[in-house]
């Protein structure tokens, strides 16, 4: 049977429990028509790139489906009817990924970065004040040291 990756986005107002119920409902439709869900991943509540149906965030869920095309057609029909589902996308694949998807690996990597803690000073270059190698306000090459600034009155008088 053909293999599919199916992702749907549920409204931000829906609770995690409601999203799990939606996933169970969709899985039931798939299995009722002779298909099989090999993997389910809930990516959680994530920000959308742009607003969809007045929503700025959505719950993302991915299903790996092994079943005939009639299963996908029925699942998509059910999702068009359901008001809690904002968008969906089904892609036919040659084989399913083993292990976690790219989105789950990214979430794990981000969590590891947060666990490391922040750097002192907050920036990549650290504190740039008072480094000692820039006397007089920066490297001037062959131009020599800076001369003192003149007042506006003195500058105007010297021009005349």
Curated annotation (Swiss-Prot):
Gene3D superfamilies per UniProt: 3.30.70.60
Region spans: Disordered: 94-160
Database matches in SUPFAM superfamilies: Ribosomal protein S6 (SSF54995)
Domain of life: Bacteria
One record GO biological process: translation
GO CC, one annotated term: cytosolic small ribosomal subunit
Biased composition (Basic and acidic residues): 94-119, 125-152
InterPro entries from the UniProt entry: Ribosomal_bS6, Ribosomal_bS6_sf, Ribosomal_S6_plastid/chlpt, Transl_elong_EF1B/ribsomal_bS6
GO MF annotation, one: small ribosomal subunit rRNA binding
Function as written in the Swiss-Prot or TrEMBL entry: Binds together with bS18 to 16S ribosomal RNA.
Family from the record: Belongs to the bacterial ribosomal protein bS6 family.
Record protein name field: Small ribosomal subunit protein bS6
Organism listed in the record: Rhodopseudomonas palustris (strain BisB5)
């Amino acid at each position: 049977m053909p293999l599919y990756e199916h992702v749907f986005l549920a409204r931000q107002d829906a609770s995690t429990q409601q999203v799990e119920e939606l996933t169970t409902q969709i899985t039931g439709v798939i299995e009722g028509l002779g298909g099989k869900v090999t993997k389910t991943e809930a990516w959680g509540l994530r920000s959308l790139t742009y607003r969809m149906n007045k929503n700025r965030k959505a719950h993302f869920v991915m299903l790996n489906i092994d079943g005939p095309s009639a299963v996908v057609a029925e699942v998509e029909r059910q999702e068009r009817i359901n008001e809690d589902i904002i968008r969906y996308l089904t892609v036919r694949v040659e084989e399913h990924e083993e292990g976690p998807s790219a989105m789950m690996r990214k979430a794990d990597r981000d969590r590891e970065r947060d666990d490391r803690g922040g750097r002192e000073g907050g920036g990549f270059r650290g504190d740039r004040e008072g480094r000692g190698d820039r006397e007089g306000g920066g490297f001037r090459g062959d131009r020599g040291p800076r001369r003192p600034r003149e007042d506006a009155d003195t500058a105007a008088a010297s021009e005349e």
